[in-house]
Amino acid sequence: MKLQLVATCLFGLEHLLGEEIEALGYERISTIDGRVTFSGDCEAVALSNIFLRYAERVFIKLGSFRAESFEELFEGTRALPWPDFIGKDDIFPVKGHAIKSKLHSVPDCQAIIKKAVVRAMSARYGIETFPEVGTKYQIEFFILNDEATLMIDTSGTALHKRGYRKDALGAPIRETLAAAIAATSRPRDNVLLWDPMCGSGTIAIEAAMLMRRIAPGRSRHFAAEEFSFIGKKLWDSAREEAFDTEIDSPFEAFASDIDGDAVKLAEKNVRLAGVEKNVKVFLADARKIAAEGRRGTIVTNPPYGERLGTVKEAEALYREIGEHFRSLSPWQVYVITSHPSFERFYGKKADKVRKLYNGMLPCYLYQYFKK
């Protein structure tokens, strides 16, 4: 079955996501803010959910059409091939978003789409009411500038939830963003990666998973595993490929923190992620870490706002780590923070700055390549 698939991501990660979709062997059709559309098949549903490191969800796209009125929304939805995917006993709830469009009431759009899907299903199955007791097919709509896109969610739980982080401290960085930051820092087998304010250890864990080629979704469940048109064999084959892809690596990462509770949590998460051979977790003050003659890269998400008492405390910390990290040169430094004036307090203008998002929170990745 030929499919159009949509992988969503945090704003700023579209390029990385597109590259890994192509690395899986699938053709990229289009890229807009927060989503990449690509062509695939049922196998692609399994492989993309299991392997994509930067995606938040993977959807099957049923179609797009102009919808400036409820009538257009109803007719456009009804014309799509819903019965090719959803059985007469299955559950099909509707949710979505409407942005910059004439149809701005989400509850009204939900009701119209639900009614249209029922009408399409009735035409195929010859019944007027549906028990909705079977497999769940979550329908998602996205209306932007009066263009409606209708999709079915194949992921279920968001893909950033790998399964290794059961608990977190404060406002943790999302796993997909941590993976992207780790990749941007260009980790290498012979260069130590150090997160000296590791919190729950996510950046170091994602870096180790990247270097070990551990597929992020290989040990979790997805909504589409219950879809009758895909089948268990495809999922079993995709998981087998995921485990076969893993390699040994001498890559080494340090995950340290001044907070003992954070260290305990990071140790637990490292074990659950299966990267304890690559990630060493210990108690340390970021303002006192030593290079000890090694080549290294600092990649960190320093506490700010919710993760620290006050903004002034955070700014004082930025000054102190700025002075200390520069003494570690020629180490490169990558800092992700939502503080809008980080460079001023850190004491040095970054060589490169990338705007990213941790969920809906705008952040900046400050990259320091040289002294």
Mark where each language-model region is.
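Non-catalytic nucleic-acid substrate-recognition regions in nucleic-acid-modifying enzymes
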Residues: 2-135
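Short beta-strand/turn micro-motifs composed of small residues
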Residues: 9, 257, 337
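Residue-level signal for inorganic ion chemistry
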Residues: 21, 94, 141, 266, ...
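Class I S-adenosyl-L-methionine
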Residues: 97, 142-184
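A short, flexible beta-alpha/helix-coil linker loop
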Residues: 99-102, 158, 303-307
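Conserved S-adenosyl-L-methionine
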Residues: 173-290, 306-307, 311-313
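C-terminal catalytic and target-recognition region of SAM-dependent MTase-like enzymes
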Residues: 285-288, 292-371
